[in-house]
Amino acid sequence: MSMEYFSGISDAMRITFVQVMILSVIAIGIFLYGMYLNIKKWGLGTTGYAQEPGGGGILVFPKVFASRIAKKGDWKLILKTLVLDILLQRRIIKISKLRWVMHITIFVGWMTLFALSLLMFLVELLSLSGVNIHPEALRQALGPWNDLFSYLLLFGIIIAIFRRLFVKRARDSTIAYDAVLIAGLTFIVVTGFIAQGIRTGDFWGLGINWGIDAAPQMALFHAVISLLFCIAYIPFSKYIHIIATPLTILANVEAEEGE
């Protein structure tokens, strides 16, 4: 399959690429609006012990957070917390090793795939703007890494499903939000593999004759649901904890480190 299938560099596929660009802008716009609402809501909290709640302005929370971080003074401790508690998630491994494997594989798989997709998207834009760059060469180089981290993400999702079905404590604590997140991630990953299988003819194509136009259509469908679920939906779901939890840990690093 030639590069036109992905990039829209040919006239036949240009609409598809433009659609993805428009959807990306819409998804990012929804995400930013959701984050605005969350940050404003967080600003309703107090700025200190025994103080009155803040006015909820958009700048209240960032100012308080920056002030608390600056007061710590120990940047080595902050860096240590950033690496161990946020990136490597050592707090979770102390609670459950299986839960940690689930979290770290989903986190690393998802974030790496997002970074690779963003890189490829930027290269496509540069190519369209006339820069002498070859998206096809980069795509082929990134192919094995995309496969690796896709399977890593799938592995984490399988663990999540296993825990929700067979681990009593996890099953009893499961709420609708959890089920939606797991189902959404599963659907996105599976459609991504199927889109790849249709394009390359591997076993993820399920041996079905999808037709000549199925590959770009399936890729576009996968892109749409990925943008809406993995970007636009974040501020309005439990996904917000991937942003809120690191901020909370950093803001309380000194107190929690001393426990």
List each language-model region with its residue ranges.
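Membrane-embedded alpha-helical bundles of multi-pass integral membrane proteins
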Residues: S2-E259
